[in-house]
């Protein structure tokens, strides 16, 4: 968290003034998230990890110039995760841009025990099957019983771990060696845990958890 953060947006001012106290409140405020410091302020235990580094050389009149393109993921391991990209002429600024953009892209996911083989009721896996796509890559994530672990690719594993998902099955199609699209397709799948609506009249056998585990409860949004 930057020590001398001066909010520049309405959402930032509401957070700094204590009128919005949680990241969940911020994301549901319908105000745009344009300051990464808001996320730092509301999720002090946020972690970040670089998952892809691309280097490209180009020739200029003054010689060869290197450009960096970075993909990073942030999360608190408890229902919140973001993926972002950053570009710069040097690695360090590109990494910072990627992490800051990941914070601006942060989402609140749903978790639960969606595996019929388990039924423990804990938020260890996905609440239901979700699909995501980016470019040529498509990703499918399925709920798994407790103890299975993350039976997914390495890139997906980092993102799910950051989101707070401990068990999942997954498979991908397309050019998964393109790490950026692989990561974005996974992120797109996690967004579906939020966008897919569940009929409130359905009596679920296990609860669905929204965001942090303190928000456990019903299937209603």
From Swiss-Prot:
Record's keyword terms, sorted: Ribonucleoprotein, Ribosomal protein, RNA-binding, rRNA-binding
Gene3D superfamilies membership: 3.30.160.20, 3.30.230.10
InterPro entries noted in UniProt: Ribosomal_Su5_D2-typ_SF (IPR020568), Ribosomal_uS5 (IPR000851), Ribosomal_uS5_arc (IPR047866), Ribosomal_uS5_C (IPR005324), Ribosomal_uS5_euk/arc (IPR005711), Ribosomal_uS5_N (IPR013810), Ribosomal_uS5_N_CS (IPR018192), Ribsml_uS5_D2-typ_fold_subgr (IPR014721)
One of the protein's GO biological processes: translation
Record-level Gene Ontology MF annotations: rRNA binding; structural constituent of ribosome
Annotated S5 DRBM domain residues: 46-109
Function: With S4 and S12 plays an important role in translational accuracy.
Family: Belongs to the universal ribosomal protein uS5 family.
Listed name of the protein: Small ribosomal subunit protein uS5
Species this protein is from: Picrophilus torridus (strain ATCC 700027 / DSM 9790 / JCM 10055 / NBRC 100828 / KAW 2/3)
């Amino acid at each position: 968290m930057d020590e001398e953060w001066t909010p520049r947006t309405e959402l930032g001012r509401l957070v700094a003034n204590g009128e919005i106290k949680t990241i969940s409140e911020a994301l549901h405020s319908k105000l745009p998230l344009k300051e990464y410091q808001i996320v730092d302020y509301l999720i002090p235990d946020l972690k970040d990890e670089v998952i892809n580094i691309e280097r490209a050389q180009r020739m200029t009149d003054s010689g060869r110039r290197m450009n960096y393109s970075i993909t990073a993921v942030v999360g608190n391991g408890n229902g919140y995760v973001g993926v972002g990209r950053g570009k710069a002429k040097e690695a360090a600024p590109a990494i910072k841009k990627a992490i800051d953009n990941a914070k601006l892209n942060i989402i609140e996911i749903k978790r639960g025990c969606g595996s019929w083989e388990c039924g423990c009721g804990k938020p260890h896996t996905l609440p239901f099957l979700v699909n995501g796509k980016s470019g040529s890559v498509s990703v499918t994530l399925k709920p798994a019983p407790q103890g299975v672990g993350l039976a997914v690719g390495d890139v997906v594993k980092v993102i799910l771990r950051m989101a707070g998902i401990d068990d999942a099955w997954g498979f991908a199609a397309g050019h998964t060696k393109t790490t950026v699209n692989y990561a974005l397709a996974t992120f797109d799948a996690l967004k579906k845990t939020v966008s897919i609506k569940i009929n409130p009249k359905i009596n679920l056998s296990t609860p669905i958890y929204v965001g942090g585990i303190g928000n456990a409860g019903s299937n209603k949004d």
